[in-house]
A protein has these predicted regions:
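Short, charged low-complexity linear segments at domain edges
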Residues: 53-74
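Active-site-proximal loop/turn and secondary-structure-junction residues that shape catalytic pockets
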Residues: 79-81, 131-133, 159-163, 184-186, ...
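Canonical Radical SAM [4Fe-4S] cluster-binding loop centered on the CxxxCxxC motif
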Residues: 69-109
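Auxiliary Fe-S-binding modules of radical SAM enzymes
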Residues: 1-50, 118, 247-372
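Generic structural signal for well-ordered alpha-helices
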Residues: 77, 114, 141-145, 167, ...
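Core AdoMet radical
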Residues: 96-112, 117-212, 218-222, 226, ...
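Catalytic cores of alpha/beta
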Residues: 164-172, 229-243, 302-312
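Conserved, mostly hydrophobic/aromatic
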Residues: 61, 89, 180, 212, ...
């Protein structure tokens, strides 16, 4: 079986840029009319000229989403385990070179955080950590999952890339989904954003979803950090990656997230500004291209945008998020990974969803379905 690296190496960044610029309105219209969409159709949907068809794309995305997922929005909350990190990433508040107080939750603190989330009726929790293998490695994660398993129906993780064996252990412990972001697929500049630490290894990170799929994880989540490089080109490669994974690890489900670069301690300014209309175009493009793909919108986005996107392709949202370890109860002043934009409570988010004519879903999965 070809690895994604084999496929990735067949493409050049500048060639994809040129192809995007050459797309015509007729190309977009033909792609919209096709029954079975390909990665080439996705490229047409995210092209600059496709913005002229945004209204048509939005209506199509709305119809396809309701047909596949109904009028529901799944809700989750992140639980940050640690802000310790061995990497230097020029855009992240947890970066090793930021001289800030580091914190890793103890078992007692972890359960205090969990209790607050349970009081908000949260049943899907996303465990997040900086990348520090000695402090927060596989044994720490396994312990956290075991402690939380009886309290939450759905546990996802977003941590450093691990080995296939380690992902198998997490799956057996009760992890339902793993999220991993390449940040950017622009290999030539990747090192500039990640000058030190294991994250500087572009290929190892690129091959992580293969290891997740081989381990039998139920759901794999991908995304890029929008704002580092040209969002259209990065998104093409991200979709290419999802396309490859679905063909080779077809038993797994897939989701895509859209983190836009947000203010953080020691942050850099975005190299490429992504306007709301651009993000809307991208979300619609993903939905029209792939009807089964889960689309997740975090509290990085503002209230107005999140209210609007509910009916146009989103299937999953975070709510009441704290992006620092202990942020819900233990240590509310510890360093955040990034600033949130939508600071509404869980109840406020649920009420907003209901007013939009949709149903907020707090539980959509249980580990019993995996035989765990």
């Amino acid at each position: 079986m070809k690895s994604f690296k084999d496929i990735f190496d067949q493409y050049q960044w500048d060639d994809v840029k040129e192809r995007l610029e050459k797309v015509t309105l007729n190309d977009v219209e033909k792609s919209l009319q096709k029954k079975n969409k390909t990665i080439e159709d996705f490229l047409n949907f995210i092209s600059p000229v496709a913005s002229q068809k945004l209204e048509t794309m939005a209506k199509m995305a709305q119809s396809l989403t309701q047909k596949r997922f109904g009028k529901t929005i799944q809700l989750y909350a992140p639980l940050y385990l640690s802000n310790e990190c061995q990497n230097i990433c020029t855009y992240c508040g947890f970066s090793l070179d930021n001289l800030i107080r580091r914190k890793t939750l103890s078992d007692t603190e972890l359960m205090m955080e969990a209790a607050v989330l349970k009081s908000m009726s949260v049943n899907h929790v996303l465990l997040v950590s900086g990348e520090a293998n000695k402090t927060v490695g596989i044994e720490y994660f396994l312990n956290a999952v075991r402690l939380l398993k009886s309290h939450f129906a759905n546990i996802s993780i977003e941590v450093q890339p691990l080995s296939e064996e380690e992902y198998r252990k997490l799956h057996e412990a009760g992890v339902n989904a793993v999220l991993v972001y390449q940040e950017t697929y622009h290999q030539e500049v990747y090192k500039q954003y990640h000058p030190k630490g294991k994250k500087s290894n572009f290929d190892f990170r690129l091959e992580t979803p293969d290891r997740i799929g081989s381990a039998g994880i139920h759901k794999i989540g991908l995304g890029v950090l929008l704002g580092l490089e040209d969002w259209r080109i990065d998104s093409f490669f991200n979709a290419l990656h999802i396309d490859y994974l679905q063909k080779n690890y077809w038993k797994s489900k897939y989701s895509v997230s859209f983190p836009r670069l947000r203010p953080a301690e020691g942050f850099i300014e975005p190299n490429f500004i992504m306007e709301d209309k651009d993000l809307l175009q991208l979300i619609c493009a993903y939905r029209i291209w792939n009807e089964d793909l889960e689309i997740s919108i975090s509290t990085r986005e503002n209230e107005k945008f999140r209210n609007h996107i509910i009916s146009l392709g989103a299937t999953t949202m975070s709510a009441a998020s704290k992006t620092n370890p202990g942020g819900y109860s233990v240590d509310k002043e510890s360093l955040e990974q990034f600033e949130t934009s939508d600071e509404r409570s869980m109840d406020e988010i649920k009420n907003m969803i209901k007013k939009s004519g949709y149903d907020p879903v707090m539980k959509d999965w249980d580990s019993v379905y995996s035989g765990i």
